[in-house]
């Protein structure tokens, strides 16, 4: 067993380059197609393993109670799946990825926790071998364990490595939140997108986010504001973060200066690999 006292891991954000809902499954989940890539926007998790047999989680922001926290749930799932008992660890989470944004911050933290536990207890285990465990924690957790830009199907756990041309991303986040349940029950959500080939290149004429219609129907004023800024803004996940991609950093910097509403914003690079 490795002798790790305090080890730091970065936990990256993702965006969905598109997100199509195909149909509803008998288990209540939805089949989808999406293309994930990562962002150089990241949290930092520090793991201090010890002999206390206690799990302590702290953060620079207010976080969910331990039993409701995805990091804690990841530890318990790891224990159950690999029969690793008596885990003692202090975890410090420095959050930079905004919550409720569609950037996968919580899922990323859970995946990073699985990787840290693997490194300490079961270093012979590959990332790919942990994907069946990761999906039990949430549909977005597998991509963060996988650690490479990928085309995803199923509920997000069937992954095919697919690089995306590196670009800059301008992220903007309004102070708006729609619950996942509200999205999926909305009459504005199309749940019958046509299956497309994973061999396609990025084609914004046929690749979109099916959840955008729901968001725009509920917040038409913000929708109009986005279109006035640039019609190519896309929503990631179920929002409420939107992004604009460009290889021209100066273009995005100029656009940032035009934003005259109180929106959180970031200018970051896309990444194909996070490990």
From Swiss-Prot:
Entry binding sites for ATP: 98-108
Record key words, sorted: ATP-binding, Isoprene biosynthesis, Kinase, Nucleotide-binding, Transferase
First-level EC class: transferase
Record: active site: 14, 140
InterPro entries registered for this protein in UniProt: GHMP_kinase_C_dom, GHMP_kinase_C_sf, GHMP_kinase_N_dom, IspE, Ribosomal_Su5_D2-typ_SF, Ribsml_uS5_D2-typ_fold_subgr
Substrates-to-products reaction catalysed: 4-CDP-2-C-methyl-D-erythritol + ATP = 4-CDP-2-C-methyl-D-erythritol 2-phosphate + ADP + H(+)
Leader peptide range in chain numbering: none
Pathway terms, separated by semicolons: Isoprenoid biosynthesis; isopentenyl diphosphate biosynthesis via DXP pathway; isopentenyl diphosphate from 1-deoxy-D-xylulose 5-phosphate: step 3/6
Pfam families in the cross-refs: GHMP_kinases_C, GHMP_kinases_N
GO MF entries: 4-(cytidine 5'-diphospho)-2-C-methyl-D-erythritol kinase activity; ATP binding
Gene3D superfamilies assigned to the protein according to its UniProt record, in alphabetical order: 3.30.230.10, GHMP kinase, C-terminal domain
GO biological process, one term: terpenoid biosynthetic process
EC number: 2.7.1.148
Parts of the chain that traverse the membrane: none
Role according to the record: Catalyzes the phosphorylation of the position 2 hydroxy group of 4-diphosphocytidyl-2C-methyl-D-erythritol.
Family the entry assigns: Belongs to the GHMP kinase family. IspE subfamily.
Entry protein name: 4-diphosphocytidyl-2-C-methyl-D-erythritol kinase
Organism, as annotated: Francisella tularensis subsp. holarctica (strain LVS)
Gene from which the chain derives: ispE
């Amino acid at each position: 067993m490795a002798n790790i006292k305090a080890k730091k891991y970065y936990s990256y954000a993702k965006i969905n380059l598109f997100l199509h809902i195909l149909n509803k499954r008998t288990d209540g989940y939805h089949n989808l197609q999406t293309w994930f890539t990562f962002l150089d926007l990241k949290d930092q998790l520090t793991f201090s393993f010890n002999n206390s047999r206690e799990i302590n989680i702290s953060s620079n922001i207010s976080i969910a109670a331990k039993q409701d926290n995805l990091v804690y749930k990841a530890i318990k799932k790891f224990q159950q799946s690999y029969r690793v008992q008596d885990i003692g660890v202090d975890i410090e989470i420095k959050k930079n990825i905004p919550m409720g944004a569609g950037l996968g911050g919580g899922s990323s933290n859970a995946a990073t926790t699985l990787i840290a536990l693997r490194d300490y207890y079961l270093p012979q285990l590959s990332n790919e071998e942990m994907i069946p465990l990761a999906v039990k924690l949430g549909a977005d957790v597998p991509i963060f364990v996988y650690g490479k830009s990928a085309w995803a199907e199923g509920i997000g756990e069937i992954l095919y490595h697919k690089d995306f041309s590196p670009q800059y991303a301008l992220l903007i986040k309004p102070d708006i939140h729609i619950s996942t349940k509200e999205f999926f029950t909305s009459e504005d959500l199309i749940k019958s997108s046509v299956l497309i080939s994973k061999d396609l290149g990025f084609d914004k004429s046929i690749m979109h986010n099916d959840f955008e219609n729901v968001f725009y129907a509920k917040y038409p004023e913000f929708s109009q504001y986005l279109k006035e800024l640039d019609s190519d803004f896309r929503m990631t996940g179920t929002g409420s973060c939107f992004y604009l991609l460009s290889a021209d950093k100066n273009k995005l910097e100029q656009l940032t200066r035009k934003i005259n509403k109180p929106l959180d914003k970031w200018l970051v690079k896309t990444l194909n690999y996070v490990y």
